[in-house]
Curated annotation (Swiss-Prot):
Belongs to the DRC10 family. Component of the nexin-dynein regulatory complex (N-DRC). Interacts with CFAP52. It comes from Bos taurus (Bovine). Residues 400-429 form the IQ domain. This is Dynein regulatory complex protein 10.
Length: 444
């Protein structure tokens, strides 16, 4: 069973009213629109928008006053001199009503908790009686809540009728709870958002939406680039780990081989030692006769050793100097290597910056390439249309030339035939005349 009684007087701050959590919460970071998208207008021009803002400002002012009623009620002596007897009396009555509501709500919550613990006794008479009593208590809450609402309206009306008392009460900002201040901040933020919304024209709203969409697309592209680089980095890390594992495997194999070599050498040394002891025992008896000769050889060798030491002392000094020189050169090479590595690191960072800039230029060139490809496709389509039209014109011209040639040939043939016919007629007439003349001569 749930209690639906916690929605009354959410702005009043009684002794235990802070247990009722406010719904509105301000955001930790305020979103600041870019300067390029700020509204062109700075003041409201229409009556409707001014009325909307005035209603919201009045609401915020009333909320600020109501949120300080608990502080004024807790300091009754100070508030009576600051607000006046009428307002102080109304505030005390409002406090009593709110306290009565909170007491009843806490009592109902406690009874409900006890009934939930005693759910096994639902069929008992006393359980039903207590449940019925709780229902009666709940039925008495709405009238009390209505009285609190009326009392709140009465106190606000008295404060608005006395601007001086309202301003004095509003100055007591330290007495406001965090929840109420959070709600007021939310209302102020809502006012700023609504004010900007009323100042923004539809064209500016569309530009703002377009700007946000562009930013979103740009962030998406950047995220894709970041994902690609992260994948490449992961691949490089995996390759490096694989190489490290291979090297570790080789090192482990070498360690195992070295361990086997050490074991083999120890066994070999032990066998050699045993054989040497046996040989020593055998040779000891044979070497007694050679002791004198060996001692003489030792004396000779000692004298030779002394001579060699004296001869090689200069060589030892030269080798020591050479060793010191080599160590100095090694230190110099190490320092040079460190300096070159630092220079290479700086050069790598510069190349990385250049690479990022070139990536940005590549994105811009891709955009330009897409535009040029589209223009090229349009030009190519126009060229195809012009080529097709030119081919049709050429074919039409060929047909016209062929027709003209055919017409000229037919006309020339007709002229030739007509000339031949006329010549044949002339020849026929000439032959007739010659025959007539021959006959006349014969008669004579």
């Amino acid at each position: 069973m749930a209690l639906d009684v916690l929605t009354v007087a959410p702005l009043y701050q009684g002794p235990d009213i802070n247990k009722i959590r406010l719904i509105a919460q301000t955001t930790k970071k305020s979103t600041i629109p870019p300067k390029a998208l700020t509204p062109a207008r700075s003041k409201l021009t229409t009556i409707e928008t001014k009325r909307i803002m005035s209603v919201l400002d009045e609401t915020i002012h009333k909320v600020e006053l109501v949120s300080l009623l608990s502080h004024a009620a807790s300091e009754s002596k100070t508030s009576e001199g600051m607000l006046g007897p009428d307002i102080a009396k109304a505030v005390r009555e409002h406090e009593d009503l709110c306290q009565a509501l909170l007491d009843r709500v806490s009592y109902l919550q406690e009874e409900e908790r006890k009934l939930q613990e005693a759910e096994d006794f639902e069929d008992e008479a006393w359980f039903r009686e207590r449940l019925f009593a709780m229902d009666l208590q709940k039925s008495q809450l709405p009238p009390l809540m209505q009285e609190i609402k009326e009392s709140t309206k009465n106190v606000v009306r008295l404060l608005l009728s006395n601007p001086q008392a309202a301003s004095l009460l509003q100055a007591q900002t330290l007495g406001r709870s965090k929840e109420a201040q959070c709600f007021i901040d939310s209302l102020v933020e809502l006012r700023g958002f609504l004010f900007e919304k009323l100042l923004t024209s539809p064209m500016e709203a569309r530009d703002k939406i377009q700007f946000i969409q562009d930013i979103t697309r740009r962030n998406r592209r950047h995220q894709e680039i970041i994902d690609t680089l992260e994948n490449e980095l992961a691949a490089c890390v995996r390759n490096r780990n694989a190489e490290v594992e291979k090297e570790n495997f080789v090192i482990q194999e070498l360690k195992n081989h070295l361990h086997q070599v050490l074991r083999f050498s120890e066994n070999s040394l032990l066998r050699t030692k045993q054989e040497a002891e046996k040989q020593q025992k055998a040779d000891f008896r044979a070497s007694q006769a050679r002791v004198a000769t060996v001692q003489q050889e030792i004396l000779v060798l000692q004298s030779q050793f002394y001579n060699l030491v004296m001869e090689n002392r200069d060589t030892e000094q030269a080798l020591r100097k050479k060793k010191y020189k080599v160590e100095t050169e090694i230190e110099n090479w190490i320092q040079k290597y460190d300096s070159e590595m630092s220079e290479k690191q700086d050069e790598y960072e510069e190349l990385d910056i250049i690479h990022k800039e070139e990536q940005l230029q590549l994105e811009e060139l891709k955009k330009r390439h897409d535009v040029l490809v589209e223009e090229f496709s349009q030009i190519q389509a126009e060229r195809e249309i012009l080529t097709k039209k030119r081919l049709e014109d050429e074919q039409e011209m060929v047909r016209m030339v062929r027709a003209a040639t055919l017409i000229q040939a037919l006309w020339k043939g007709y002229l030739v035939r007509s000339m031949l016919k006329s010549k044949k007629k002339k020849r026929g007439k000439g032959k007739g005349e010659k025959k007539g003349k021959g006959k006349g001569k014969g008669k004579k």
